[in-house]
Every structure is written in structure tokens, then in C-alpha cells.
């Protein structure tokens, strides 16, 4: 890696920077009018995320509007599933629906090996266009869903309130679930390598539903497979920073640190100062402003950013929300978040 790296990549690598980089999870999406207008013309989420021209355009919308330090691929954690033989649809206001939820060993044995350059070439295309056009004015981010969260979707068949189906599999037929998780870990590792090869400079793993596990079960069904993904990626790209985000992770921070990731993205339910004490010093911190705060006034947003930043001092740090930005968030408040974030200095 040459010098003149973009700010977010420099910070993620632990280099000295003048201010913390700032971006937002789900920064491209429903809170932006320009996105809603485009959605009216292209109502299918899968088309918006799998047509390279549309995905590129949407990925660039927040960059053009707010100039965040990170430009993240517009996609979905379920996007790689069809390449493994699992079809899905995303229904507006209902979320993802899996066509044939996984229930038995035959389905798992019939899963295809993911070959990203074949089934996900549109992702490669978008990332290389972003890398070229963003031109190091920001860092290009890729992302994936972690094995446990993907398994939760494909076993439950949709979003769930209590995850009874996947937990039933975990506690009645653990061997079956481990086989599925292992398949996902290898596939997702390959997918991340493909994203990095295509232009992603930093990548984030979302294990959105791992916070539904007890710490004991996290150590069996989530942590080892996160680590497997990280190991696969680091073997080929040891320098590429990896961020891990789990919603509801306050009870898991020490465990997350053992997966080999470079940065832990915190949700807003943990005090960032406390998190810094619990997470080993070499690991960076990202987060963790409550996205609900962006429904407040500008002063409260600025004040919370200052507090969060001051509590993170002395650490490798990236300013972000503690969850994706919420639909209905006023765009001018998102702008305040980015503008004020960029005024912070070390």
C-alpha cells in the first residue's frame, strides 16, 4: 500500500490521523429523497442492489450529498445466497423471504459452492467503479453477513422475533447447523476476498443476530465461524482492515475481540468508555451514536458526537452510528452528523 491513503483506511490501519473518519451504516437508503425517487422507478430491491448501474448510483448518493469518509457498497447481506442455490426476495416493509427454508441435511449437502466471480460479478463491477471514481477521496467499503446471521435467515425463512427455528436446530441437531455454518463461513470468506480484489479497501462483517445468543452459545455457533471468515480473508489479504458489528453486543465484546478482527463496531447500548476498557488496546472502535438521536435537534446531535468522541480518545476510532440510520431521519440531520464529525480534531 502506497502513501496518500484515504483517511478511513489510514485510521483503520492504526496510522496517525488528524481527525476520526466518519461514515454511517445504511448511509445509502430510504431516508434520502433521491433514493426514494429512484425506488419508485425500480421497485424491486434485488434489482436495485444487483443491477451494477443502480447499485453504483445508490452507493454514490450519500457521497455526493455529504462527502462521508467511507463509501459503502449498496447491497444486502443475503445477496450471495442465490449463488449457493438459496433463492430469496425482499418485500418492502416485510423484509427478506427465503424461498425454501433449510430444514434437513439433503438441502445442506445440495448447496452450491459460492464462486463470487460468476454469481456476484455485478458486485465486483460496482466496487471497481467506486474505487476508480471515488479516487481515494474516501475509502471504499465492502461488507458481508456472518454465517450465524445468514443461517438464521435461511432456517427461519424470514426475520424472526425469537429465533425459535434456528435455536431448535442448534440445540436438537447441532451437527446439521455446524455443517451449514461451515459452508457459509467458507463461502463468505471467498466472497470477501472477491470484494477486496475488486476494490474494497476496508470490509465489515455484520452478525446482526448473534446478539440473540447467550455468550456460551456465541462461543459455539457464532464466534468460531466469524473467526473462520477472518482467517480465510487474512491469509490472502493480511493488511485489509476488518470491522465486526453485532447488534446487542454489550455482553460479547471480549469474545468479539478474539475473532481476529481489527475494529469492533459498537451498538449504542454500551458506553464507549466502558467498551474501550473491555476491548484490547490494539483493536479499534467504531460507533456508536444512537440513530434515534438523528430525530432530535442539531445541538443534541453535535453534543452527543463530542461526548462520544471524547470518550474514545486514545483509541483507533471511526465515528459512526450504533446501528443503520433509520428511515424517516431528516436529511439535514444526517448532514449535521457528517459536518460536525469532520470538525473533530485530535
From Swiss-Prot:
Primary location recorded for the protein, binned into one broad class: cytoplasm
Superkingdom: Bacteria
Positions marked as site (Transition state stabilizer): 76
Keyword set, alphabetical order: Cytoplasm, Decarboxylase, Lyase, Porphyrin biosynthesis
Gene Ontology terms: biological process: protoporphyrinogen IX biosynthetic process
Entry's Gene Ontology cellular component terms: cytoplasm
Function in brief: Catalyzes the decarboxylation of four acetate groups of uroporphyrinogen-III to yield coproporphyrinogen-III.
Subunit details: Homodimer.
Protein name per the record: Uroporphyrinogen decarboxylase
Organism (species): Prochlorococcus marinus (strain MIT 9515)
Amino acid at each position: 500500500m502506497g502513501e496518500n491513503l484515504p483517511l478511513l483506511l489510514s485510521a483503520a490501519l492504526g496510522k496517525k490521523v488528524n481527525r476520526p473518519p466518519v461514515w454511517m451504516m445504511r448511509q445509502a437508503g430510504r431516508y434520502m429523497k433521491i433514493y426514494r425517487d429512484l425506488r419508485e422507478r425500480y421497485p424491486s430491491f434485488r434489482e436495485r442492489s444487483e443491477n451494477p448501474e443502480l447499485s453504483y448510483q445508490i452507493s454514490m448518493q450519500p457521497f455526493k450529498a455529504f462527502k462521508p469518509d467511507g463509501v459503502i457498497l449498496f447491497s444486502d447481506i443475503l445477496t450471495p445466497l442465490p449463488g449457493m442455490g438459496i433463492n430469496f426476495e425482499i418485500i418492502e416493509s416485510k423484509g427478506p423471504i427465503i424461498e425454501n427454508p433449510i430444514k434437513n441435511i439433503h438441502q445442506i449437502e445440495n448447496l452450491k459452492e459460492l464462486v463470487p466471480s460468476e454469481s456476484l460479478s455485478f458486485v465486483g463491477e460496482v466496487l471497481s467503479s467506486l474505487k476508480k471514481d471515488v479516487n481515494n477521496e474516501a475509502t471504499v467499503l465492502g461488507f458481508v453477513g456472518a454465517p450465524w446471521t445468514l443461517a438464521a435467515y435461511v432456517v427461519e425463512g424470514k426475520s424472526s422475533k425469537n429465533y425459535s427455528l434456528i435455536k431448535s436446530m442448534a440445540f436438537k441437531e447441532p451437527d446439521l447447523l455446524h455443517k451449514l455454518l461451515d459452508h457459509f463461513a467458507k463461502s463468505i470468506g471467498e466472497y470477501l476476498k472477491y470484494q477486496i480484489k475488486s476494490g474494497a479497501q476496508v470490509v465489515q462483517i455484520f452478525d446482526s443476530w448473534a446478539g440473540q445468543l447467550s455468550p456460551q452459545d456465541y462461543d459455539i455457533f457464532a464466534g468460531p465461524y466469524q473467526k473462520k471468515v477472518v482467517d480465510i480473508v487474512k491469509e490472502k489479504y493480511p493488511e485489509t482492515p476488518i470491522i465486526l458489528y453485532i447488534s446487542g453486543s454489550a455482553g460479547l465484546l471480549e469474545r468479539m475481540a478474539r475473532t481476529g478482527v481489527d475494529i469492533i463496531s459498537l451498538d449504542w447500548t454500551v458506553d464507549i468508555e466502558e467498551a474501550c476498557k473491555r476491548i484490547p488496546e490494539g483493536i479499534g472502535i467504531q460507533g456508536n451514536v444512537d440513530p434515534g438521536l438523528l430525530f432530535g435537534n442539531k445541538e443534541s446531535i453535535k453534543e452527543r458526537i463530542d461526548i462520544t468522541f471524547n470518550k474514545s480518545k486514545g483509541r483507533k476510532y471511526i465515528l459512526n452510528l450504533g446501528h443503520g440510520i433509520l428511515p424517516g431521519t431528516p436529511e439535514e440531520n444526517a448532514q449535521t452528523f457528517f459536518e460536525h464529525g469532520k470538525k473533530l480534531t485530535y
